[in-house]
Amino acid sequence: MKNLTLAVCVYNAEKYIKETLQSIMAQTMQDFYLLIVNDCSTDGSIAIIEEFFAENPRQYELVSFEENKGIGYARHFAERYAQTEYMMFLDADDILYRHAIETMYKRITSDNELMAVGCYLEYIDKKGEKIGGGIFLGEKTKESFRKKAVAKKLFFMQPTAIYNRELALSVGGYVIEGYPKGKPRYQDFCEDLDLWTRMSDLYKYGKAIIVVPEVLCKYRKGSGLSSNSFNMIIKMRYTKTNLLRRRNGKKELTFIEFYDSLSPAQLKEMHKDANAADALRNGAYYLKKGNLLNGVWEIIRCIYYRPLYIWDKIKHNSGIKK
């Protein structure tokens, strides 16, 4: 009996979904359920998926929403719809290396103390070409994970990971309740950070989350101007606040309660952090486009808002923190 569900949440991914499916079909391990969640795509994504599997038969299940719900809701649904012990998500525009699933699955099933196993990602552009950098986050050993968990740290790890679905659900899984209606959908930002941090509470039962320190997936990185950093930063602060509340035996806040509790001064500081993040990304965008003047100006703006932000990004995205 298959013990792993691979879920791909799709929304208007017609340019990339075929390449993603090809990487799934090329996996050295195929003993998993494939669940595709269509988040009310309005392009040709679903036709491409159906045509692909007509030509390349394998088990898959397609579930379609009647309205667009967002990635947070789609993962929340898939996590509860699946019946297997283990779960994995893959973005509809990312590409797995052939041994990715087998490598992570063997690792997590070899040690009952492991509740999630991730990997490193490398960045590619819209054409699938490597652009340098990647995501090299996560602890490589159970000991380093537990040290971090005891210290009440947020747990950053990329989303392409295999995790114990039942343990995740025991701490709430992907949470969508308690958020304001409409956009921005704060539940769609840093949803993986929230999940891993919730699961890190289980360190007290001897459980751990680690990464295989190997690049196993290609992550398609957008190259446009950035403007969403504030939403991510406030979600990170919310996740940290609830981490501390849980560890201190207090009831968690809903996102609405957390936002309403923030003072004008706190919001101002978060906007500074967001401005630094957006400026750095936009500076890199302009420099890549050959627009030296705007690129340098954005870098200066980043340094003005947060002088150490650039160095922190270099450490995380270059792999220095491996």
Region locations from a protein language model:
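Short loop->beta transition adjacent to catalytic acidic/histidine clusters or analogous donor-positioning motifs
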Residues: 2-5, 25-36, 44, 57-61
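Short, well-formed alpha-helical segments that are part of the catalytic scaffolds
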Residues: 13-26
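A conserved acidic beta->alpha catalytic loop
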Residues: 38-47, 67, 91
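Flexible acidic/His/Gly-enriched loops in nucleotide-sugar-dependent glycosyltransferase catalytic domains
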Residues: 57-58, 73, 101-177
